Amino acid sequence: MELRARGWWLLYAAAVLVACARGDPASKSRSCGEVRQIYGAKGFSLSDVPQAEISGEHLRICPQGYTCCTSEMEENLANRSRAELETALLEGTRALQATLAAQQRGFDDHFQRLLNDSERALQEAFPGAFGELYTQNAKAFRDLYAELRLYYGGANLHLQETLAEFWARLLERLFRQLHPQLLLPDDYLDCLGKQAEPLRPFGEAPRELRLRATRAFVAARTFVQGLGVAGDVVRKVAKVPLSPECSRAVMKLVYCAHCLGVPGARPCPDYCRNVLKGCLANQADLDAEWRNLLDSMVLITDKFWGPSGAESVVGGVHYWLAEAINALQDNSDTLTAKVIQGCGNPKVNPQGPGTEEKWPRGKLALQERPPAGTLQKLVSEAKAQLRDAQDFWISLPGTLCSEKLAMSSASDERCWNGMAKGRYLPEVMGDGLANQINNPEVEVDITKPDMTIRQQIMQLKIMTNRLRGAYNGNDLDFQDASDDGSGSGSGEGCPDEMCGRKVGRKSASSRTPLTHALPGLSEREGQQTSAAAPTPPQASPLLLLGLALALPAVAPRGR
């Protein structure tokens, strides 16, 4: 009986072993059905996918264990992972580009509207108040506003010279209008300017407008220029191609888990960060100059307020013009007597009317309108958005990992570490190119920075210097900082024939501008300002010097 029971037990055990041998899934290659489904959903041919796992000696990127990926599949997925990251990078920067473009349009529209409203107010009020003093010289006022628009728009105009010429020519025109019966040749008008200088025929208006307009207009146009340059930098950097080493690392990060039969495993957080910190190391080097630019832009908005701020001055040019004509009417008799005393009696114009023009004595008192609050709202929104964007470049790897690459929420045994499901142990690298020398995931040659990004770093430096100069009221006579003409001083920029050269101005004659005729601008100042404008800083030599200093003397890392 005991022997029979033992025999039955042996038969049962043998049957169980046979059944297990026949039915154990682990004893056979695993199916690639899930990988086939994912691969086909990406538009690839299912004929490339094996039915079951195969040996992985052919793999060049993924670990060479049993795999569901052929060589062709690995290559296709590597190309797809690179394209997906480049698309994610473009999408990740698109919102910032849109924000900067919207800010640029908003501020540009506002400043243009202020200037247009000022000219409209002048055209409505001056004819009734000043009569022919204005109507016969209306073109001079239109030309002034046209040149102010060009200056704001980025044209290489010298604003002080522009204003100096305006006042000098206006004085000549009005003096001719006062004495139509006299012949007034150019040499007599030169003498007129010298005699008029100590008399300040226009009162303090020319000096006040010169001081305030220089600060206000340069602040406004430099700020709008800065928004354009920032947007250009983001746009160009977003298009910088990924390196081959980065492409390999991204393939391993995103799709090698599929090839190894664990498509549900998401990348470990620190693993993803190391891959993207290596891929975007050059982009992270923008951080310091990017912060400097945005800080300078936030700071210069302080120059938009107060009596000398852009809001008051750009929208109030006509107030100073009205004050000037009021003063000239008060000083006309004294001016005429002093000019004749100092320059002599001019010859009589045989074709003149024979009598002096009777000056109208109307005065124009304009009430300043309080700001509508539009600029305050624009500045408030811009400050918040610029501050939010300060850490954009160094936060980009983490943002892409969490929003675009389906990173795991925790680093544990269930996440993909590049080799298998399990914890990721290496430490996270720092930001920037120099910190990638020991990156375990991406081979980065820290001695070869990306030249496109280095050029954009230089553009940020140049623009920051202009903003700092504008904050101190200095016009650095800049041209467009970007190399393709976008991001110019206003949203529309300025015409090609105007930007990048001195804008020619038509005058009553071809002689030297009467800068010495202006109150508050001495003859020596006039000679200085009428000299050739300094050439704007060129990026090329500075860039070479900057790169020579910036490149770390570290040998390429071996693998």
Swiss-Prot record:
Lipidation (GPI-anchor amidated serine): 530
Highest taxon of the lineage: Eukaryota
Post-translational modification: S-nitrosylated in a Cu(2+)-dependent manner. Nitric acid (NO) is released from the nitrosylated cysteines by ascorbate or by some other reducing agent, in a Cu(2+) or Zn(2+) dependent manner. This free nitric oxide is then capable of cleaving the heparan sulfate side chains.
Alphabetical keyword list: Cell membrane, Copper, Disulfide bond, Endosome, Glycoprotein, GPI-anchor, Heparan sulfate, Lipoprotein, Membrane, Proteoglycan, Secreted, Signal, Zinc
Disulfide bonds, paired cysteine numbers: 32-68, 62-256, 69-259, 191-343, 246-279, 268-415, 272-401
Molecular-function annotations in GO: copper ion binding; fibroblast growth factor binding; laminin binding
Keyword Zinc applies: yes
Tagged with keyword 4Fe-4S: no
Glycan attachment residues as annotated in the record: 79, 116, 486, 488, 490
Principal location class: membrane
Gene Ontology CC annotations of this record: cell surface; endosome; extracellular matrix; extracellular region; membrane raft; plasma membrane; side of membrane; synapse
PANTHER family noted in UniProt: GLYPICAN (PTHR10822), GLYPICAN-1 (PTHR10822:SF8)
The protein, known as: Glypican-1
UniProt organism field: Bos taurus (Bovine)
